[in-house]
Regions:
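Conserved small/polar residues in nucleotide/adenosyl-binding loops
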Residues: 206-213
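Hydrophobic alpha-helical segments, chiefly the membrane-spanning helices
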Residues: 217-218
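Hydrophobic anchor at the start of a short beta-strand
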Residues: 30, 117, 174
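Glycine-/Pro-rich loop/turn segments that contact NAD(P) or position catalytic residues
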Residues: 98-136
């Protein structure tokens, strides 16, 4: 890590905070950009820039003061990074951000690379919703294509009775996906040095009996 002096992070939420914690363990300095003065990551970052994610001047300042730049989440205007990545060391670049900002684009890209996904169709209005349901069938999930997270901007449709809640989402472009039964959701963390890609083993941890705080036990 001696070659990297300062890591710039676009976004000061909890993910940014966790990046900073690990960066400090590796001896790196950090500078964080976020519009909120009380952003969680600001508590431990070495430097801060209070500014909007869509402010070209703020992004330029972050890049100029950093040896390498990353972003903590996908809701950063990707078009602003196109020019910046030509001048500064933004390892992830523009493309992953661009793809992850639109669920339709993200799934289409996955299919193009041979990955298996649930059946999906673009939905722009009620007519296209009915066409998509006719093809995919119930149960299915309607999702907004952008700015959805942690279940926000989604509706599970199990039959015609659920169409009313689907209409609430149709004010913006959506995607309809086949419902996939699942037992659990797993997160896979990958890292790359530009040549190699390494991931931690995927595991499912059971603790039995469940640990209890001593104060609760008493």
């Amino acid at each position: 890590m001696s070659a990297v002096k300062t890591i710039g992070i676009i976004g000061g939420g909890q993910l940014g905070l966790m990046i900073i914690e690990q960066a400090h363990l590796l001896g790196a300095r950090t500078i964080c950009l976020d519009p909120a003065e009380d952003a969680p990551a600001f508590k431990i970052s070495d430097e801060r820039i209070v500014g909007r994610f869509d402010d070209p001047a703020a992004l330029e300042e972050l890049c100029r003061r950093s040896d390498v730049v990353t972003y903590e989440f996908e809701n950063v205007p990707g078009n602003l990074l196109v020019a910046l990545e030509q001048k500064y060391n933004i390892k992830q670049g523009f493309r992953p951000l661009f793809d992850s900002q639109d669920r339709l684009r993200e799934k289409s890209n996955a299919c193009d690379h041979g990955l298996k996904t649930p059946a999906f169709m673009a939905v722009d209005d009620e007519e296209s919703l009915h066409r998509a349901i006719a093809r995919i069938g119930y149960p299915c999930v309607l999702k907004t294509r952008t700015l959805g997270y942690d279940g926000h901007g989604q509706a599970v449709l199990r039959g015609e009775a659920d169409l009313a809640k689907a209409r609430e989402l149709l004010a913006v472009p959506c995607i309809l996906e086949e419902f996939v039964p699942f037992d659990f959701e797993a997160s896979v963390v990958l890292v790359s040095d530009g040549e190699r890609v390494i991931c931690f083993p995927v595991c499912l941890l059971y603790t039995s009996p469940s640990p209890r705080d001593r104060s609760v036990s008493r």
